[in-house]
Amino acid sequence: MTVEQKIIFFDLDNCLYPKSYKIHNMMAARITAFFSDKLGIPTEEAERLREVYYRHYGIAIRGLVLHHEIDAVDYDQRVDQSLPLEKVIKKDEVLREMLLELRKKYKCWIFTNAYIVHANRVLKYLGIEDCFDGITYCDYNAKDLIAKPMPEMYERVMREAGVTDKDKCIFVDDSYGNILGAREFGWKYTVQLVEHGDPLPQPQAGSHVIRDIHKFKHLLDEIDGE
């Protein structure tokens, strides 16, 4: 019987690059403008609705598609693809070296709620596009959008990555909700990234917390010793 290799599922935005890049802020502003334009509502109402959909569905676009019949691909072009990532994201050689070292022992997989175009852009500008065995993303062309923290999304990433044993899955994400969802789904190793200066979550959502993605390998050494 073949023993499955452990796999690390990495979130992308605000996880493999720091929040100080403020990409989330730029994205939020574009989403709000898109809401306001497409739905014909004031900016304040658009901001409120964006937050409601994000909290409830994991991604704002799912709420737009479900309740307003918005074209998700048009949303992607107007929001994600309009971000000037090339001016903001810098190549991260330390991260690259860590990932290449990890791949000697683990499968490494991107697991993001972004669309594939945005994900590929981020990986390219970070200089790590060749450091992963695959990528699972939110398919904006799908009839029914699924995203973290929906259980179906965790099922999908395991299926696409070819892993069946939940105890072989190691997941790192900055989102409390996504980490909690993964733990409730049954993944044993769920690691929330909480940057230095941000308060630690109470109660803790996952099995572990790290402050710096570049120190992730040190945590893996601890996990392997458990």
UniProtKB/Swiss-Prot annotation:
The family database entries (SUPFAM superfamilies) matched by this protein are listed as: HAD-like
Q: Name one GO cellular component term.
A: nucleus
Q: Name one GO molecular function term.
A: 5'-nucleotidase activity
**GO:BP terms for this protein?**
nucleotide catabolic process; pyrimidine nucleobase metabolic process
Pfam families the record matches: Hydrolase (PF00702)
User: What InterPro entries would the database entry show?
Assistant: HAD-like_sf (IPR036412), HAD-SF_hydro_IA (IPR006439), HAD_sf (IPR023214), Pyr-5-nucltdase (IPR010237), SSM1_domain (IPR052791)
NCBIfam families, alphabetically? HAD-SF-IA-v3, Pyr-5-nucltdase
Can you tell me which family this protein belongs to?
Belongs to the SSM1 family.
Name assigned to this protein: Uncharacterized protein C24B11.05
